[in-house]
UniProtKB/Swiss-Prot annotation:
Residues 105-138 are annotated as: Disordered. InterPro entries: NA-bd_OB-fold, Primosome_PriB/ssb, ssDNA-bd. Residues 105-121 have a biased composition (Low complexity). This is Single-stranded DNA-binding protein 3. Residues 1-104 form the SSB domain. Keywords: DNA damage, DNA recombination, DNA repair, DNA replication, DNA-binding. NCBIfam families: ssb. It holds the Pfam family SSB. A motif (Important for interaction with partner proteins) lies at residues 133-138. GO terms for biological process: DNA recombination; DNA repair; DNA replication. The lineage of its organism: Bacteria, Bacillati, Bacillota, Bacilli, Lactobacillales. GO terms for molecular function: single-stranded DNA binding.
Length: 138
């Protein structure tokens, strides 16, 4: 059986770092991952995927990857369940990240955040071209 996940997305907020009673670091975070197709309005939608990472990798992620950071992770899908205070059974599906990698420098991330995620910083104030996927040769 194979349970491998590879995701590339942006952190929706800073990771929440906590420690277990046995002093093991664990961080939870969410990645916004763009879908490969556009909706009926012509816009790309994103999936927001809950993730968890453990030990030294958790501390590293919490220290270095902040909201908006482009991150690549490898890991596996995990399902678990628990009973909440109202006695209801709650089911959770999340990605357990085993490794992560920052995919852009801190400087480029800060520039992206400061420019309001503008994509025209390299090309001046050029107008955006409207190219549909049907026009592409591949």
């Amino acid at each position: 059986m194979i349970n491998n996940i590879v995701l590339v997305g942006r952190m929706t907020k800073d990771a929440e770092l906590r420690y277990t009673p046995s002093n093991q670091a664990v961080a939870t975070f969410s990645l916004a991952v763009n879908r490969n197709f556009k909706n009926q309005s012509g816009e790309r939608e994103a999936d927001f995927i809950n993730c968890v990472i453990w030990r030294q990798q958790a501390e590293n992620l919490a220290n270095w990857a902040k909201k908006g950071a482009l991150v690549g992770i490898t890991g596996r899908i995990q399902t678990r369940n628990y009973e909440n205070q109202q006695g209801q059974r709650i089911y959770v599906t999340e990605v357990v990240a085993e490794n992560f990698q920052l995919l852009e420098s801190r400087n480029s991330q800060q520039q992206t955040n400061q420019s309001g995620n503008s994509s025209n910083s390299y090309f001046g104030n050029a107008n955006k071209m409207d190219i549909s996927d049907d026009d592409l040769p591949f």
